[in-house]
């Protein structure tokens, strides 16, 4: 009898877990219905550029003194970064000469990097400013696309590609750090009243920003594209997407999973 009860309990738990997994993860007011793509964010430099050694040293120091963790909790609700820590790293590389560091960022990568009003903001942007402050440098941000990062570095338009960028690591002419953060591009609905599965999106309207990376992620799922009623490309960034979802103007949106911790 005890074995039968135990077996029944295990089956019940298994069924419950399968049911929950099919309904997506709920984060605050929102539900993650599907993960379309996983990205790894890295920082790119020109080969043998001394900028890397100073930036790396500053990052190790900021990781050791808790600055990076504080920023991560502010933007993500947790510290999910993987920077090396060394409180003495800046002392080991010596004093850096004053300069302006040109930082190439994806301006549509909330909450990593984005434009708010007339200025840049986001986790990567604030961290780059902290790095420059610790080095006695000034940060200047320039909008780029991940696919153009190496061209921008080679031309001298930027000194570092850093800000919501998933960089290819194949070109030996450039130096790319180990990934410091992993992110997913996901489909999100309202937790209350929204679709719980991809099947529930049949005939629905899905919105994304005008950045091509989101359409590329969606295009990998042909069955989903055929199931949707309408796909909208909207301007105004991530905030606009959540506004449209909250108002009922659209049924689902494509965003970074990291954004849910901020908006959820």
Regions found by a protein language model. Give the residues of each.
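Soluble non-cytosolic domains of exported or imported proteins
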Residues: 45-53, 62-63, 118-126, 143-147, ...
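Bacterial N-terminal signal peptides that target proteins for export
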Residues: 1-9
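C-terminal motif of bacterial Sec signal peptides marking the signal peptidase cleavage site
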Residues: 19-22
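Acidic, polar ligand-binding/catalytic clefts
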Residues: 26-38, 45, 94, 125, ...
């Amino acid at each position: 009898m005890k074995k039968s009860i135990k077996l029944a309990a295990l089956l019940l738990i298994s069924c419950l877990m399968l049911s929950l997994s099919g309904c997506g993860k709920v984060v605050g007011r929102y539900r993650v219905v599907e993960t379309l793509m996983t990205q790894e964010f890295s920082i790119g430099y020109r080969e043998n550029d001394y900028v890397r050694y100073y930036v790396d040293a500053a990052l190790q120091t900021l990781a050791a003194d808790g600055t990076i963790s504080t920023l991560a909790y502010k933007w993500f609700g947790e510290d999910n970064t993987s920077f090396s820590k060394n409180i003495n790293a800046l002392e080991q590389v010596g004093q850096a000469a004053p300069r302006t560091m040109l930082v190439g960022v994806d301006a549509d990568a909330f909450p990593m990097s984005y434009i708010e009003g007339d200025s840049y903001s986001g986790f990567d942007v604030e961290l780059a400013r902290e790095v420059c402050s610790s080095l006695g440098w000034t940060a200047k941000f320039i909008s780029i696309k991940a696919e153009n990062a190496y061209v921008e570095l080679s031309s001298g338009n930027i000194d570092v590609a850093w800000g919501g960028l998933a960089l290819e690591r194949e070109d030996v002419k450039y130096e790319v750090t180990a990934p410091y953060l992993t992110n997913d591009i996901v489909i999100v609905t309202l937790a209350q009243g929204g679709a719980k599965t991809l099947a529930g999106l049949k005939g629905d309207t899905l919105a994304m920003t005008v950045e091509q990376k989101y359409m590329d992620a969606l295009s990998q799922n042909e069955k989903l594209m055929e199931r949707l009623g309408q796909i909208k490309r909207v301007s105004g960034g991530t905030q606009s997407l959540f506004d449209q979802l909250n108002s009922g103007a659209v049924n689902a949106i494509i965003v970074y999973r990291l954004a849910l911790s901020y908006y959820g």
